[in-house]
Amino acid sequence: MENTIVRAENYNAYFGDNHVVKDVNISINKNEVIAVMGPSGCGKTTFLRGINRMHELIPNATAKGKILLDGENVYDMNAIYVRSKIGMVFQRPNPFPNLSIYENVIAGYLLNGIKVSKADKDVIVEKSLTSAALWKEVKDSLHKKGTFLSGGQQQRLCIARAIAMQPELILFDEPTSALDPISTSSVETLFHELKANYTLIIVTHNMQQAARVSDRTAFFYMGELVEFDDTKQMFTAPADQRTQNYITGRFS
């Protein structure tokens, strides 16, 4: 499909002999918001980390199968390039504590030795913070440490850091689980705005959040992709009994 941005083909992930993601096949389109849900230990975060080759950074972790980005297997690409095209935002806000807000935004360039002029850095910082709905709040405090910000602001700073590398796809691993309700609402609003320019894949334990923010939802159980469908359809008439059991709270 011409509109497909990322596709998994028979993707499997392991920690040693532990088979944690099993034969996943899924196609995700450009400018979609995808929720990935399932009980703890079902493989959803491991799958997410496989998309941008972060799974392989864990000792004793291996993978088989393909993850295709724009039709090309990410395992045939330079890993640093892959992680610039596929950004990631983690569960807890993690700005670099010794860097200023300004430096945090361009950290990807600094860490990878990519030379950028001061004028270009200024443009990248303003555009990225604006896209993350943070510029107006911090434009007069760019010299302050990233940890100076509130939890919700720190998470939006981390989103700006991902955006700065001009990715096609942004992965979110339970990005609001450590935030208060007001900050969570701000980040969820941001998801809808980011969809215009990026594809978002969001791992969440919060079924209400999945229903609010996503176009389609993937349900994982015991390492398997059980169901992948339009979010409204999945929540109102799931095709698989295991999905129904999870949604209705029969297991968690």
Locations of the language-model features?
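Short helical segment in ABC ATPase nucleotide-binding domains corresponding to the A-loop/adjacent helical element
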Residues: 52, 101-111, 122, 214
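ABC ATPase NBD coupling module
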Residues: 60-62, 73-87, 111, 196, ...
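Conserved ABC ATPase "signature" region
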Residues: 66-73, 118-140
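Conserved ABC ATPase signature
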Residues: 144-149, 153
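Conserved catalytic motifs of ABC-family nucleotide-binding domains
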Residues: 166
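Catalytic Walker B motif of ABC-type/P-loop ATPase nucleotide-binding domains
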Residues: 170-173
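ABC ATPase "signature
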Residues: 228-229
